[in-house]
């Protein structure tokens, strides 16, 4: 498979959300860079007997909204996007990895994200959905990455027997059904995440592309410690660098960053649930190795773990409600200037001193799994 093999890719996406005859399918796209993907998916959906509507949600227009719109308008669900969720049985959003320059008051950016988060909640509750993140040369250049490498890894990440991957990951999730505590640790600190009584679920070719992770919803008041995310990533058009979070009894009580701190604080103050975690996840896609700065891709990398302040997956037993759901990725492999780290769940090592252990590598998708040394 290569980056332009859209016919294969969109069949995987359509299979993942179960597009079938009579379905009402809404499609969003954030930039013309993904138009070939959108066209291929629309054609595939019509071929299957669905009714398809396409909405342009180009993120470049956000700058005008941020400049002129009142706060109450920014923080409300965009009406056309909300109407699409009410109409749809299936929703797919093709999101180009672009680098819009957002220069606005962080409180206004957070308000805009809050409005979009309301649409995301509708998407979760009402539709069978998928997000497809697509790399671009512009993104690679902005993040000082080799564009060919990023595209090559991205294309390879689709190439798996997803039904078999789902079986393997489900078996691991079943194994974790009695787990009590997950711990992420490195030389900068440790974060203890309570997961007792929660359900783990596999993401294996259904709601996000690239895909490949297992995840659960932390117990709301059972997360404590400190975690640091070295390096830079982008959220809402703003670069956040060297983020550090401190949690006590499930609540984020302090945040620090060398860049983007004002946005971080504004996002975490969005509503009552934004300072509690809604997700704890572990990446399982071995085809992805490069931290791109795009959270939707990086969270799938084998050797990483991630947390998400905000809205919890109810299917995991999570009850935290928020307009925010913000995945933040911790690279435990020691790449990109950060130290090697470890992940254990109860007394079982999943990643130890930067090395993926067999319990995790054996469920990996993509290129041949990594194996811990004997």
What would you call each of these model-derived segments?
Residues 1-225, 360-374:
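Active-site bordering "gate/hinge" segments
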Residues 10, 176-177, 220, 236-239, ...:
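Short solvent-exposed loop/turn micro-motifs enriched in small/polar/acidic residues
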Residues 32-33, 97-99, 136, 198, ...:
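Short, glycine-/Ser/Thr-/acidic-enriched flexible segments
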Residues 41-47, 199-200, 243-246, 272, ...:
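Short, solvent-exposed amphipathic alpha-helical segments in soluble enzyme
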Residues 86-88, 92, 187-198, 204-221, ...:
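PLD/PLD-like phosphodiesterase catalytic module centered on the HKD motif
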Residues 221-266:
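Long, well-ordered mid-to-C-terminal structural blocks that present hydrophobic/aromatic surfaces
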Residues 224, 254-321:
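Dual-mode signal for accessory low-complexity, basic/Gly-rich regions
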Residues 293-371:
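Internal helix-turn-beta structural module
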């Amino acid at each position: 498979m290569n980056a332009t093999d859209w016919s294969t890719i969109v069949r995987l996406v359509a299979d993942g959300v179960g597009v079938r005859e009579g379905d009402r399918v809404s499609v969003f796209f954030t930039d013309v860079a993904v138009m070939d993907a959108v066209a291929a998916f629309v054609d595939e959906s019509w071929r299957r007997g669905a009714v398809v509507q396409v909405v342009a949600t180009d993120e470049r227009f956000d700058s005008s909204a941020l400049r002129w719109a009142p706060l109450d308008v920014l923080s409300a669900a965009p009406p056309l996007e909300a109407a699409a969720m009410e109409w749809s049985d299936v929703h797919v959003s093709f999101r180009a990895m672009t680098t819009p320059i957002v220069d606005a008051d962080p409180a206004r950016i957070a308000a805009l994200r809050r409005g979009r988060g309301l649409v995301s909640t509708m998407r979760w509750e009402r539709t069978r959905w998928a997000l497809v993140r697509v790399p671009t040369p512009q993104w690679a250049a902005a993040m000082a990455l080799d564009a060919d490498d990023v595209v090559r890894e991205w294309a390879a990440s689709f190439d798996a027997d997803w039904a078999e991957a789902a079986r393997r990951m489900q078996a691991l999730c079943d194994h974790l059904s009695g787990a009590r505590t997950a711990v992420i640790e490195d030389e900068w600190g440790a974060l203890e995440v309570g997961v007792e009584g929660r359900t783990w679920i596999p993401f294996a070719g259904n709601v996000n592309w690239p895909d490949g992770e297992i995840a659960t919803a932390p117990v709301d008041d059972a997360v404590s410690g400190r975690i640091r995310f070295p390096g830079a990533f982008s959220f809402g058009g703003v670069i956040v660098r060297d983020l550090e979070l401190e949690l006590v009894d499930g609540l984020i009580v302090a945040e620090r960053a060398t860049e983007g701190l004002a946005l971080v604080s504004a996002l975490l103050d969005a509503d009552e649930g934004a300072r509690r975690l809604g997700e704890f996840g572990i990446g399982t896609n071995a085809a992805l190795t490069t931290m791109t700065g795009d959270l939707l891709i990086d969270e799938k990398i084998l050797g990483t773990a991630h947390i998400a302040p905000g809205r919890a997956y109810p299917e995991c037993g999570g009850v935290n409600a928020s307009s925010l759901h913000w995945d933040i990725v911790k690279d435990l492999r020691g790449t990109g200037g950060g130290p090697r780290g470890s992940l254990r769940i109860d007394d079982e090592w999943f990643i130890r001193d930067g090395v993926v252990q067999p319990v995790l590598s054996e469920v990996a998708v993509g290129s041949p799994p990594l194996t811990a040394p004997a």
